[in-house]
Structures are given as C-alpha cells and as structure tokens.
Amino acid sequence: MNHLEIEFKTMLTKEEHDRLLQLFADISPISQTNYYIESDQQSIRHAHMAFRVRTFKHHEAELTLKIPQEVGALELNQNLTPEETENILQNNEFPTGEILETLLQKEIPIQDLKILGSLETIRYEKEDKIGLFALDESHYLGKKDFELEVEVEDFEKGKENFLDFLKQHKIDYKPGKSKIARFSENL
C-alpha cells in the first residue's frame, strides 16, 4: 500500500502529553516497535529516505520506505509475514516487492543494510475533522519523548488547523524531528 503522507507534529512535555491523553480516553493504545535499517555508509540517509520494519502485537509487521516529495513523503508499505519479519530482523534478508525494487533502482547496496536498533512507541490514534491524530510516547536508547502528530489531506489547511488545535489546548508548537532522526542522533 502506497500513500502520500502529509503530517504535522510537535514535541510535547510529559504534562502536555498527559493532558491531551484525556482526549483519547476512549481509545486503547497501540504498542509498536520500529526497527530502523541503514548501512554503515548511511546510503539510505544520503538518498534522503527512511527505512524501517514496524512490528505490532499479534505478530503483525510492515516494511516501510519513506521517500520525500515536494509536499509530504511518499510512503511505500509492504505487509510482512512472520517469517519475512524474522528474516529481516535476524538475517538482514529483505523480501521481494516494490520496496526492494525501489532500493535497487536507487542503487542502495542491499547487502550492506542492517538493523541499527529499535524505538518502541505507545500510540493513541484518533480520527478527527482535522485528520488522523497520533499521541505518542516513545522509548529508545535509554531516552523517552512525547509527541503529537496529525496526518492531513491538505498541507495549508492542515497546518492552520493543527496550529489552531495547539493554541486551543494551550500547547506551544515545538518542531520535532522524525523518530528516525531522533533515534539516529542518539546512536
């Protein structure tokens, strides 16, 4: 499944996270783990992409390659079987499909790719008139952080609505890097 991801995010304090959590009181959290994939030469980063395996409870997993666009990022997603997931995580063996083809087209040395580490997130998701909200608490490399993301259809309208939402909830906008960037900075 491929889609154009247009999202806005802000970093949160623990207090802001806990305050917003009240808006998600009727939502059960999703536990997910991102395993970030890169080469020693940082070929994925140099190609301005992000590459990960995301696992969920109940042995569900997906492989994702994010490719920046003029607005947002093209997200290529491929569902994984438990065997494919294990082959990636244990043996750095990637399944055939559009993601592998794209990496090869971009001359990424597949044989050099490996798992850098993982980031665990407790996520609350809720659809709203603005878009799909995700309230996250992430743990990685001995660190913990909090963020609010909203995925929208329209960049300009989405940005305006997101900033209005933050103002309404008395939260200062604090730009945040992507999870993979925050993870990588702490390696």
Labelled PLM ranges:
Residues 1-187:
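Phosphate-end processing signature that detects enzymes handling 5′-triphosphorylated RNA
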